Curated annotation (Swiss-Prot):
It catalyses: S-sulfanyl-L-cysteinyl-[protein] + uridine(34) in tRNA + AH2 + ATP = 2-thiouridine(34) in tRNA + L-cysteinyl-[protein] + A + AMP + diphosphate + H(+). The gene is mnmA. Catalyzes the 2-thiolation of uridine at the wobble position (U34) of tRNA, leading to the formation of s(2)U34. It is found in: Cytoplasm. It comes from the Bacteria. GO terms for molecular function: ATP binding; tRNA binding; tRNA-uridine 2-sulfurtransferase activity. Keywords: ATP-binding, Cytoplasm, Disulfide bond, Nucleotide-binding, RNA-binding, Transferase, tRNA processing, tRNA-binding. This is tRNA-specific 2-thiouridylase MnmA.
């Protein structure tokens, strides 16, 4: 009997081709699109967003074309709680979160997996560019064949059980080849552009989104220097992030950057560029994939944000909750709330959230 797999389909080229590849490999494939955002005009009218009508229809058409059943599953409540509310609260606390990491942890590889298991499926699948491999009796994640498109950074929270029941067929291909396959089999999405914005904020206006969600929580405050001297007024801490230079709306006669955000005092600290370079950080909510726990110092390559270049570092266990990361060279704009992710060559070691 064929193994059954439920694949999350966004209407994009990657998940569409992933569904086709799995069917070709002999799996019984069921396509699902996850409804994540509320029934609200702001979300439903945003063309191209993850839950737009066009995305659902693209996924439905692909499923019909490749001959697999298709359903829409509703995860709006848990997505609101675990992703949208988390994103909003972190910004209001002066941090800069990565909602894709929260979505993967709680929605794609938890809620969707549980839903798939309830349908009697053996696996879930996605169109992510990662390779899941079993080595020495343990599941690990390695970078994809296409390093430019590699998405392992957002996968560091995965557990052994999740990895055991997850397939990511695109990880063995270059993106160009995925598009070629889509064209060869007659999928209209073969040239659909990649989505780069946060799925629930298609206009990319983070501040505007948070103000809409929590209008009373966004308050003006002071720009200050590191000594606390007031330099001007800011429009609300949600509009700023560490390392930001543009859009500050303050004239100081020199180039200045956001060096810290103090949510308790509702202050944005600004200073010289050299003040945004640091060579160590502490991470918490850490997860490791090749082993359960970090017990001794380890040399790694570490990334402090999705698009950052990995830099040489040593990670040290501090206690059950925290890991210290010491970089060989100072890093620009280490940002609270972002994730730091560790690699050993192409092996994803793990990661955590920057304190």
């Amino acid at each position: 009997m064929n193994k059954k797999v439920v694949i999350g389909m966004s209407g994009g080229v990657d998940s569409s081709v992933a569904a086709y590849l799995l069917k070709e490999q002999g799996y019984d494939v069921i396509g699902v699109t996850m409804k994540l955002t509320p029934d609200d005009a702001f979300y439903t009218e945003q063309e191209g967003g993850c839950c737009s009508l066009s995305a659902v229809e693209d996924a439905r058409r692909v499923a019909y074309r490749i001959g697999i059943p298709f359903y829409v599953v509703n995860f709006t409540d848990i997505f609101k709680e675990k992703v949208i509310d988390y994103f909003t609260e972190e910004y209001l606390n002066g941090k800069t979160p990565n909602p894709c990491i929260a979505c993967n942890k709680y929605i794609k590889f938890d809620a969707l997996l549980k839903k798939a298991e309830s349908l009697g499926a053996d696996y879930i699948a996605t169109g992510h560019y990662c390779r899941i491999v079993e080595e020495n009796g343990r599941y690990v994640i390695r970078k994809s064949e296409d390093e430019k498109k590699d998405q392992t950074y957002v996968m560091y929270n995965m557990t052994q059980d999740q990895l055991k029941h997850t397939l990511m067929p695109c990880g063995d291909y270059k993106k160009d080849r995925i598009r070629e396959i889509a064209r060869e089999i007659g999928l209209n999405v073969f040239d659909k552009k990649d989505s780069e914005e946060i799925c629930f904020i298609p206009d990319n206006d983070h501040g505007g989104f948070i103000k809409r969600e929590c209008p009373k929580a966004v308050k003006t405050g002071n720009f200050v220097d590191k000594e606390g001297k007031v330099l001007g007024k800011h429009k609300g801490i949600i509009y700023y992030t560490i390392g930001q230079r543009k859009g500050l709306g303050i004239a100081t006669g020199k180039r200045v950057f956001v060096t810290n955000i103090d949510a308790m005092k509702n202050q944005v600290v600004i200073g010289e560029e050299e003040e945004i370079f640091e060579n160590e950080l502490i991470s918490f909510k850490n997860n490791f994939i090749p082993f359960d726990k970090l017990t001794e110092p380890m040399e790694v390559d570490a990334k402090i944000r999705y698009n950052a270049k990995a830099s040489k570092a040593t990670i040290y266990p501090v206690d059950d909750e925290n890991v210290k990361v010491k970089f060989e060279k100072p890093q620009r704009a280490i940002t609270k709330g972002q994730s730091v992710v560790f690699y050993d060559g192409d092996l994803l070691v793990g990661g955590g959230i920057i304190k």
